[in-house]
């Protein structure tokens, strides 16, 4: 049953992706020859206007055919003959639909949440190294660590893990004022937890109630972080 749900989810993702191309093409006045869900032999098809709608045997792909492979097509409504901005919009529409799908799925997953951890310092553990007069203080909201933007609480540990050493340049908000701290020493320390030795950076973060606005914000930045991760993986 798990495989069936996985196939259906993948088919939905493809449908939304190709549907994004299709909708953008129609809105831009670009000719769509075929809109198909699936690959391989045709199971069902129907032509409406200039477009053939088809369901194919293998639910592992799809296509929105706009004459993009025919360089000899002289129709001004063919994809290759459309204005550059129209082609850009059509190409971007597929990815945009997948992003929106991910946003909706995450929002549904976050819906039951009662609260979220924020990037605001609440307190320090005994061995925390980054406090003091020139370091972090309880109530500080972290904005950036070594150039890495902090949107969610998890971004702090990600940014700290990226550091080549334990000294960080940090932008934060303290008492409503934006501050820049240089060379803040934050190194993981060993702590005893339930009889085991574990490493922590040594600070606690505050939580906030999961209001509708907070859920939307956390969902948005979760999607942004996925995009950021993909971009970084390509570097």
List the predicted regions and their residue ranges.
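Small-residue-rich helix-interface/hinge motifs
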Residues: 2-74
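Alpha-helical transmembrane spans of integral membrane proteins, capturing the lipid-embedded, hydrophobic core
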Residues: 7-14, 91, 95, 99, ...
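Hydrophobic alpha-helical segments
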Residues: 8, 22, 91, 220-222
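Short N-terminal helix-initiation segments at or just after the protein's N-terminus
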Residues: 1-5, 114-117
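Residue-level signature of transmembrane alpha-helical entry/exit and packing/kink sites
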Residues: 2, 6, 82-91, 95
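PDZ peptide-recognition modules
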Residues: 70-85, 97-235
């Amino acid at each position: 049953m798990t495989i069936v749900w996985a196939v259906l989810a993948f088919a939905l993702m493809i449908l939304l992706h190709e549907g994004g191309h299709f909708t953008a093409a129609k809105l831009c006045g670009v000719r769509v020859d075929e809109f198909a869900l699936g690959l391989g032999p045709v199971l069902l098809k129907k032509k409406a206007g200039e477009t053939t709608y088809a369901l194919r045997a293998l639910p592992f792909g799809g296509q929105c055919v706009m004459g993009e492979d025919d360089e000899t097509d002289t129709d001004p409504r063919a994809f290759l003959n459309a204005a550059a901005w129209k082609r850009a919009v059509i190409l971007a529409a597929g990815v945009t639909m997948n992003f929106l799908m991910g946003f909706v799925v995450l929002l549904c997953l976050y819906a039951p949440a009662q609260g979220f951890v924020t990037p605001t310092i609440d307190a320090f553990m005994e061995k925390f190294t980054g406090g003091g007069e020139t370091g972090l203080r309880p109530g500080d909201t972290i904005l950036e660590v070594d150039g890495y933007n902090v949107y969610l609480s998890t971004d702090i540990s990600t940014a700290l893990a990226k550091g080549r050493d334990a000294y960080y340049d940090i932008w934060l908000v303290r008492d409503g004022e934006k501050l820049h701290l240089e060379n803040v020493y934050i190194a993981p320390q060993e702590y005893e937890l339930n009889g085991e030795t574990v490493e922590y950076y040594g600070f606690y973060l505050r939580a906030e109630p999961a209001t509708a606005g907070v859920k939307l914000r956390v969902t948005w930045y979760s999607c942004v972080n996925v995009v950021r991760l993909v971009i970084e993986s390509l570097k």
